[in-house]
Amino acid sequence: MLRKKCGKIFIDCRNENKRSILTAFIFYSEDTMTERSANIITHDPFGSLLGYAPGGVAIYSSDYNTADDKEFPNDAAFRSYLGREYMGYKWQCVEFARRYLYLNHGVVFADVGMAYEIFSLRFLRQVVNDALLPLQAFANGCKRKPQAGSLLIWQEGGEFKHTGHVAIITEVLPDSVRIAEQNVIHSRLPSGQQWTRELPMIVSEQGYFLQDTFDDTKILGWMIQTNDTEFSEPQPFPKSTALQLQAHHVDNQGQFSGKWLNENEPFDAAYIKAMHGHKVSHSDQYRYFAMSESAQQELIHATNELHLMYLHATDKVLKDDNLLQYFNIPKLLWPRLRLSWQNRRYQTITGRLDFCMSERGLKVYEYNADSASCHAEAGDIMNRWAKQAGGVLGENPSDGLRNALADCWQHSQASKLVHILQDHDDEEDYHAMFMQQALVQAGFQAKIIHGTEGLHWDNRGRLIDNENNQVQTVWKTWAWETMLEQLREDATEMEVAPPIRTGYPEDKVRLIDVLLRPEVLVYEPLWTAIPSNKAILPVLWSLFPNHRYLLEASFHLTPNLIQNGYAQKPIAGRRGDNVKLIGENNSMLDTTDGQFGQQDSIYQQLWCLPQVEEQYLQICTFTVGGHYGGTCLRSDSSRVIMGNSDMQPLRVLKDKVFFGQKK
């Protein structure tokens, strides 16, 4: 299967010095090298066509012992895509199951860490429109008969230790079922046979029970896309104590009393300058926080589901002028917004979801889909902090973030030279460098531009840099709102198109002249200004009322919000500016200043952050290409996380360790 569920990275056994992103397939193949089951006979090398499942879906050999290092030199080479749609790792069981559903039914299930986790999912995504279709799980032995086309899921253990397994039921016979799968049998199927194994089925008054051909495995059950929930399993939820956060400390042996970062490296030097020293936060350098593996799984599921929910809300907004007007985006730009959504809906690189996670549950505050930060600390600095500290428990849940970003860039439409546009800001310096590293790793050239310095027009009106390279692709740290502010200032009611300059050497190139230029491919796309705007929150609530990850939100104060408390947020605010937290009886719990006080506001149900060791803690997850990419933690002594709030080391602990060491 594809990934270690806590986000752990395994070393590629063919190259001990190369870290690979979330490659549980290496872990699985290492085991099978020395402990290969006698039930599996390997004849055909990795990638060989073994046969076909119904619908002409190819089944490939996944004998990793025979994978060619030249053809598969790194982790990215193992990733399987059909067009823009990611299937999984070649040629794992999950890759086959997702590809089967995609080709035969036009649906896919959300990304998972291990095959057995599929049994906890409750929706499939329809690829053509991102509609969420109900998916029900039926336990092995229940009264709901399995049917052809169902997913069949195994628990981790035995032949499928660590990962579990997934197959497709192709036929249901009176006393057996036939299945198609990958990563079990590596030899060719008989001509015309469209199944890999036949499993006995016991039928009784109690229900239908499937037996595996391996005697050390457990079949969890089958999954059917249906609205009918009779005999189905409820969606599992982690117990409340699993969603708590813990504080841990390493022994102070002077590890952080001196210089532990490399001041000669530009990235390190920029980070040190921004932090005013060699430190991971402005608080205790020897403290870190931990969450359970169950909590991490819940965050993965929430991230994947919420991203799709935000896409649905964005689609609704862009189809309704009455909703779009709440976002305070100049009407001059509405056609561009809709074109961006139509043409670049799936061309995102990364964003960040902000959560409150505690024993009360998991709730999302907002989605920074436009100009997210925190990647550099989570994907680089926190690893080096842990190495310097020594004796740190668990794993960094963003360990593979840079690799994930590099892979996403490889499958993007970006030109070979990407210009990174950033503000004159110390923090943005190292954020830009981190993304530059990911781009270079992906095989691109990346040039950092501060503001619009060095950009100008040639004699034909093309936008070029100071080395005469044409600007074709831009990744920006700027929020789209900054450009919108410029547009509001410069555009007049007489304008019939965005006022983009295309010449005049004496004129200074403005941000708007870069980001709105039609031939410049900007990441993140213009449409991400919609999900990043707080005005999306009431739309989300109207589409998915009482959803377990959402907080009530409204454009106007409601009796329920007044009674139970609310947060007042400016619709295009950033960095926690101009937020008011109002408790019961209209009591002011907290308020922040900032530059967004004149904006319209939305009102969101009050849901305060948990406090651990006098720090209010906010969990954040990264999306990469629309899928979960990592987790980080921010903290502050006040209830509102702001731009200058700390990042904190975060580790994922196995549940038994988490509960055994809970303080």
Where are the language model's segments positioned?
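Preference for protein termini
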Residues: 2-3, 232-663
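Short, Lys/Arg-enriched N-terminal segments with co-localized hydrophobic residues
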Residues: 19-32
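N-terminal capping segments
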Residues: 34-123
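...with weaker cross-activation on analogous glycine-rich loops/strands in unrelated enzymes
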Residues: 119-184
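Aromatic- and glycine-rich peptidoglycan recognition patches
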Residues: 161-235
